């Protein structure tokens, strides 16, 4: 039986208000709010302010991580939400970010991580990484 160990949401938000995503000061409460709304366990976080504008940040979670990067000149926010355990936590954090950032267009990829767990012969399987 296939069971994943986590959900990884990779998303690009387009058409986001550039004033909202220009600074870490504006992004911090939105990202931290997503962590709370998703019922995630924050271990630590770090944010970086680009000059003249733009922000990046990562929140280390007991469940994995949430990270973002902004390009205010394009109205673009790229997001990475990876959580282990209950997949609803990643979905809830993503829903919160969508509601707060109000993108006009969104592209997403949702990946089940560790989906070979439980597969017959997994222990004997050899994986080649290039």
From Swiss-Prot:
- Catalytic residues? 64, 69, 84
Please name every pair of cysteines joined by a disulfide bond in this record: none
Cell membrane is among the record's keywords? no
Which cellular components does GO assign to this protein?
A: cytosol
Pfam families named in the record: AdoMet_dc
Could you give a GO molecular-function term held by this entry?
adenosylmethionine decarboxylase activity
Q: Which residues carry this modification: Pyruvic acid (Ser)?
A: 64
Its domain of life reads Archaea
SUPFAM superfamilies, per this entry?
S-adenosylmethionine decarboxylase
Print the keywords alphabetically: Autocatalytic cleavage, Decarboxylase, Lyase, Polyamine biosynthesis, Pyruvate, S-adenosyl-L-methionine, Schiff base, Spermidine biosynthesis, Zymogen
One GO BP annotation is: spermidine biosynthetic process
> Recorded E.C. number(s)?
4.1.1.50
What residue ranges carry the coiled-coil annotation? none
PANTHER family membership: S-ADENOSYLMETHIONINE DECARBOXYLASE PROENZYME
Write out the function statement from the record: Catalyzes the decarboxylation of S-adenosylmethionine to S-adenosylmethioninamine (dcAdoMet), the propylamine donor required for the synthesis of the polyamines spermine and spermidine from the diamine putrescine.
Quote the subunit structure annotation: Heterotetramer of two alpha and two beta chains arranged as a dimer of alpha/beta heterodimers.
| Protein name (Swiss-Prot/TrEMBL) | S-adenosylmethionine decarboxylase proenzyme
Species of origin = Thermoplasma volcanium (strain ATCC 51530 / DSM 4299 / JCM 9571 / NBRC 15438 / GSS1)
